[in-house]
């Protein structure tokens, strides 16, 4: 799992496996630290997702940490179904396939001139994790 703040957008990249508890706890600290400056969260995952106990810890976070727009982009049917089934994120979060980046950007309010930077950041985080990254739209 890797994440970085780009402007007011938090970009998160997951590998095909779930984050370890150590990774997840570090991520929760990052969320608390940076969320006052974050308007939206973009998650790209190749199949990894938080575990039930990890989501329970996330759901105990302050409302400002949870109350932001989010988009999950993935080719994983499992991850798409899991996010769609989460009532706590129903109103603010949307799930998109890897062919629907434009929809994710529209949902998050990412401007056209910012999109190439966001996609380059997603690719860099994935490569840093050792992932074989698909060709993302330009």
Which residues are covered by each model-predicted region?
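Amphipathic, Lys/Arg-enriched alpha-helical "gate/interface" segment within cytosolic domains
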Residues: 1-138
């Amino acid at each position: 799992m890797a994440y970085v703040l780009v402007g007011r957008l938090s970009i998160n990249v997951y590998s095909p496996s779930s984050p370890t508890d150590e990774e997840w706890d570090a991520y929760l600290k990052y969320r608390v630290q940076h969320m006052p400056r974050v308007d939206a969260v973009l998650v790209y995952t190749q199949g990894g997702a938080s575990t039930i106990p990890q989501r329970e810890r996330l759901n105990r976070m302050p409302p400002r940490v949870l109350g932001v727009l989010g988009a999950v982009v993935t080719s994983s049917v499992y991850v798409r179904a899991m996010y769609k089934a989460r009532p706590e994120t129903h109103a603010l979060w949307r799930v998109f396939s890897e062919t629907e980046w434009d929809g994710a950007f529209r949902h998050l309010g990412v401007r056209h001139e910012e999109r190439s930077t966001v996609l380059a950041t997603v690719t860099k985080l994935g490569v840093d994790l050792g992932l074989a990254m698909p060709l993302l739209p330009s």
